[in-house]
C-alpha cells in the first residue's frame, strides 16, 4: 500500500478544523480515493472528532497512532479511556488504533519494560473490544532492533492487525558491518509475519 504524508503541506497546518476538507481535497488532487488516513494522537487527549469527521467525509478509515508520551503508567482503565472508546465508536468509521508503536526502539518513552507494555496494550485492547467494535488494535513494532520485537507481543487476543515501521537505513541495527544496500526491505517483515501469521 502507498500513501502520502500531507501534514507538512502548509495548506493543512494548524488545527484540523481549519481545513475541514483536506482529505477530500487531497483525493481530488491525486485523482484517487484513499482508504485510510493516518494521524498521530497523544494519549490523554480526547478522541479527534474533527479529524474523524473529515475522514468520514472522504470515505475512509482512520489509523490513529495513539501515543502514551507520559509513559505507560499513564494508561489506566479509567473514565478517559472508556470515553475515548465511546467517541471512537460514535465516529461511525473504522478506526485502526496503532497503540504505542515502535515499542522495541529506545527512542520512545514506552520502551524498556516489555511486561508492562504488554499489560497496557492488553488493557487498551480490552476497553476498545468491549466498547467500540469498529476499533481494531494494531501492534506495530519497528523493524529494528529485531531481536527485541517478540518480547513486546501482547498476544493474539489483543492484536487485530499487525504492522511494522520500516525506515531506510544503510546498516542493520546500526552496525556498519551489516550493510543493507542490496537488501529487500520486505525481508524485515519476516521477523513478525513468519511468527504471527
Residue ranges and their predicted role:
Residues 33, 60, 157-162, 197:
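Glycine-enriched alpha-helix->loop->beta-strand junction motifs that scaffold or abut catalytic
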Residues 25-28, 151-153, 191-192:
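Short, flexible, glycine/charge-rich loop motifs used to bind or transfer phosphoryl groups or to couple energy/partner
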Residues 79-161, 165-187:
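Active-site cleft segment of glycoside hydrolase catalytic domains centered on the general acid/base Glu
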Residues 2-94:
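N-terminal carbohydrate-binding/catalytic regions of secreted carbohydrate-active enzymes
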Residues 1, 8, 15, 19, ...:
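A general marker of short, structured functional hotspots
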Residues 50-60, 65, 167-197:
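Glycoside hydrolase catalytic-domain groove-lining segments
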Amino acid at each position: 500500500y502507498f500513501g502520502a504524508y500531507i501534514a507538512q503541506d502548509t495548506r493543512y497546518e494548524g488545527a484540523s478544523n481549519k481545513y475541514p476538507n483536506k482529505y477530500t481535497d487531497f483525493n481530488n488532487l491525486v485523482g484517487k480515493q484513499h482508504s485510510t488516513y493516518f494521524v498521530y494522537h497523544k494519549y490523554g487527549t480526547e478522541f479527534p472528532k474533527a479529524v474523524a469527521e473529515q475522514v468520514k467525509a472522504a470515505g475512509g478509515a482512520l489509523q490513529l497512532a495513539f501515543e502514551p508520551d507520559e509513559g505507560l503508567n499513564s494508561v489506566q482503565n479509567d473514565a478517559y479511556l472508556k470515553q475515548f472508546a465511546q467517541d471512537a465508536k460514535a465516529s461511525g468509521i473504522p478506526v485502526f488504533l496503532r497503540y504505542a508503536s515502535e515499542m522495541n526502539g529506545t527512542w520512545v518513552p514506552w520502551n524498556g519494560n516489555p511486561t508492562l507494555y504488554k499489560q497496557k496494550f492488553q488493557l487498551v485492547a480490552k476497553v476498545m473490544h468491549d466498547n467500540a467494535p469498529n476499533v481494531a488494535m494494531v501492534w506495530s513494532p519497528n523493524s529494528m532492533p529485531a531481536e527485541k520485537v517478540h518480547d513486546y507481543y501482547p498476544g493474539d487476543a489483543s492484536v487485530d492487525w499487525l504492522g511494522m515501521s520500516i525506515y531506510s537505513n544503510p546498516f542493520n541495527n546500526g552496525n556498519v558491518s551489516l550493510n543493507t544496500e542490496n537488501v529487500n526491505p520486505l525481508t524485515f517483515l519476516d521477523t513478525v509475519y513468519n511468527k504471527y501469521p
